[in-house]
């Protein structure tokens, strides 16, 4: 990238890529990334413990949270009402 310094057009490629300011900026960039990464993980954990709501008019201010799903029923599916299966073949009933 070209920039102007003291009335002269200079190319930034003439500077060393390993100058001290680049190294320190790179270090602080990585440090901020790590801090923000763990901060977002902890914020999600806090939201889960609080019932995922920051408003004071929530119904679940005591920390209980919303009610969970009902337990799954095991066994045959009875809620599909359809025709009965045909009788088994073989016997004529005589």
Curated annotation (Swiss-Prot):
One of the record's GO cellular component terms: endoplasmic reticulum
Residue spans crossing the bilayer: 20-42
Membrane-protein topology: Single-pass membrane protein
Localisation: Endoplasmic reticulum membrane; Cell membrane
GO biological process terms on file: calcium ion transport; endoplasmic reticulum calcium ion homeostasis; protein palmitoylation
Keyword Nucleotide-binding: no
Reported modifications of this chain: Cleaved by CAPN2/m-calpain in resting macrophages but not in activated macrophages. Macrophage activation up-regulates expression of the calpain inhibitor CAST/calpastatin, resulting in inhibition of CAPN2 activity. Truncated SELENOK proteins produced by failed UGA/Sec decoding are ubiquitinated by the CRL2(KLHDC2) complex, which recognizes the diglycine (Gly-Gly) at the C-terminus of truncated SELENOK proteins.
Annotated region (Disordered), positions in chain: 48-94
InterPro entries: Se_SelK/SelG
Residues the UniProt record annotates as site (Cleavage): 81-82
Record function comment: Required for Ca(2+) flux in immune cells and plays a role in T-cell proliferation and in T-cell and neutrophil migration. Involved in endoplasmic reticulum-associated degradation (ERAD) of soluble glycosylated proteins. Required for palmitoylation and cell surface expression of CD36 and involved in macrophage uptake of low-density lipoprotein and in foam cell formation. Together with ZDHHC6, required for palmitoylation of ITPR1 in immune cells, leading to regulate ITPR1 stability and function. Plays a role in protection of cells from ER stress-induced apoptosis.
Name the UniProt record assigns to this protein: Selenoprotein K
Record organism: Sus scrofa
Species lineage: Eukaryota, Metazoa, Chordata, Craniata, Vertebrata
